[in-house]
Amino acid sequence: MDWDYYTLLKTSVAIIIVFVVAKLITSSKSKKKTSVVPLPPVLQAWPPFIGSLIRFMKGPIVLLREEYPKLGSVFTVKLLHKNITFLIGPEVSSHFFNAYESELSQKEIYKFNVPTFGPGVVFDVDYPVRMEQFRFFSSALKVNN
């Protein structure tokens, strides 16, 4: 019986050591991968997961006006499984308009606009085609002097 007890004890200690070492290794790797630019603050709401959604559904403008003084001009609101980051003001929203497609994709939002123009046009095409269509639209809509 003593042999089984010591074998179990040694195995348990070995497993604990492996988990501790694995945790240390993964935590050191995750610290190295952190972004140089800090992420925007996240709105903490109660109850978790649905608190932000409830406030957002009551009035998104009210939520923005209440949280802007507390969280600043850039902050994130968690709505169920989605994160929505708000950029308030011209000094921070310029990045939104000038960002590369690889940095800031609007693909999910464009899906809602497909019925407006139809399939294969503007919001239902790849980025290079969309940019070409935007150039065409902008030149067609310019006022000639």
From Swiss-Prot:
Subcellular location(s) per record: Membrane
KO phenotype (gene knockout): No visible phenotype.
GO terms of biological process kind: methylation
Tissues expressing this chain: Expressed specifically in roots.
Signal sequence range: none
Alphabetical list of InterPro entries matching this protein: CYP450_sterol_14alpha_dmase, Cyt_P450_E_grp-IV, Cyt_P450_sf
Organism superkingdom: Eukaryota
A Gene Ontology molecular function term of the record: oxidoreductase activity, acting on paired donors, with incorporation or reduction of molecular oxygen
Main location: membrane
Topological type in the membrane: Single-pass membrane protein
Keyword Transmembrane tagged: yes
Similarity annotation: Belongs to the cytochrome P450 family.
Protein name as catalogued: Putative sterol 14-demethylase-like protein
Native source species: Arabidopsis thaliana
